[in-house]
């Protein structure tokens, strides 16, 4: 199989490394308008690059494309790839105004579309989803990290999270909602508070407190921000017969044994793959697992865990939360 990775920034290079690790037989080429990025990928990963997508498609003749550019450009790139007959894998999308046309084009061209939703491939999320099944629970969840610490090697003003249309809080909401809905159920009511509490040079709220009512009776409080100086994900779930804790890392999942009155650690990983440039709650395992899932999807072995149809509804929900007064 031949794969084109479009966008050779941090996510594109991560995907190349993990594709090489997943299946060394996959042929890879890259696309990026920045010569320095193409050269870095050539030097570090042995991957040739193009500066033009059309030329890359014509000359490399790929079977599939990984779209790893800024989310604001995903739509145009995805449509060009689909119209050229390529299966596509997109990183998280923060705009859904192109979804209907893409789904229609994919059907016409007999192409497959796969959307990254990395947390659905975390083993802890799989465990939590099963643990709360058929229970009525409440949960409290905080997901936050100070925006300048996201990419310490560059200014936050230099990438998409500073753009109001694809802002940092919108991204985190779009990352978290797919697994929150899969685990706790369809959302039927939402109430939110938001404000700007920092001196960050952004024109959007930097924190949200969101109350969620789920169709099955579950309720949650979701606190999301780009303020917390210690990047963290912290979840507490409780019911009459369950008390569960998770701090976003593979080592931090535990349940309370109410008979012995002590926390029991839940270890789900034989090996954890970590990139130390990122916060402790970001691990490589799930990124690789969703690449495997994409390849399996292309081979007819498994279906995506998150669809564009589902994601369209989630992005509409995020827009509603952003627009609430």
Question: What are the roles of these predicted feature ranges?
Answer:
Residues 171-254, 281, 288-301:
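Contiguous beta-strand/loop segments that form the cofactor/metal-binding neighborhood of enzyme cores
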Residues 64, 70-71, 75-120:
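Beta-strand-loop-alpha-helix segment that lines the small-molecule cofactor/substrate pocket
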Residues 64-67, 215, 281, 286-325:
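C-terminal helix-rich "cap/oligomerization" subdomain common to oxidoreductases
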Residues 119-193, 198-201:
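Predominantly a Rossmann-like dinucleotide-binding segment in NAD(P)-dependent oxidoreductases
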């Amino acid at each position: 199989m031949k794969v084109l990775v479009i966008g050779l920034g941090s996510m594109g290079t991560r995907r190349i490394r993990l594709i090489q690790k997943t299946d060394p037989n996959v042929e890879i080429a890259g696309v990026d308008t920045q010569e320095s990025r193409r050269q870095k990928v050539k030097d570090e990963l042995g991957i040739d690059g193009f500066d033009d997508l059309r030329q890359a498609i014509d000359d490399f003749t790929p079977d599939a494309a990984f779209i790893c550019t800024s989310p604001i450009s995903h739509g145009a790139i995805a449509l060009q790839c689909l119209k050229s007959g390529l299966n596509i894998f997109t990183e998280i999308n923060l705009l859904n105004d192109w979804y209907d046309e893409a789904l229609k084009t994919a059907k016409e061209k007999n192409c497959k579309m796969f959307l990254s939703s990395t947390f659905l491939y975390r083993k802890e999320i799989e465990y939590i989803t099963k643990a709360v099944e058929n229970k009525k629970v409440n949960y409290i969840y905080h997901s936050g990290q100070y925006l300048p610490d996201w990419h310490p090697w560059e200014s936050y003003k230099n990438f998409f999270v500073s753009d109001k249309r694809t802002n940092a809080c919108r991204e985190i909401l779009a990352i978290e909602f797919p697994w929150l809905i899969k685990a706790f159920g369809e959302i039927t009511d939402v109430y939110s508070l938001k404000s700007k509490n920092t001196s960050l040079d952004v024109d959007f709220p930097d924190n949200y407190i969101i109350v969620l009512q789920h169709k099955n009776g579950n309720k949650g409080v979701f606190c999301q921000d780009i303020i917390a100086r210690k990047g963290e994900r912290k979840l507490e779930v409780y019911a009459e017969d369950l008390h569960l804790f998770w701090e976003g890392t593979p080592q931090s999942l535990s349940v309370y044994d109410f008979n012995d009155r002590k926390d029991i650690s839940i270890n789900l990983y034989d090996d954890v793959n970590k990139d130390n440039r990122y916060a402790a709650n970001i691990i490589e395992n799930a990124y690789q697992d969703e690449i495997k899932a994409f390849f399996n999807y292309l081979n007819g072995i498994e279906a995506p865990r998150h669809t564009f149809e589902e994601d369209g509804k989630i992005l509409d929900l995020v827009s509603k939360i952003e627009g609430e007064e």
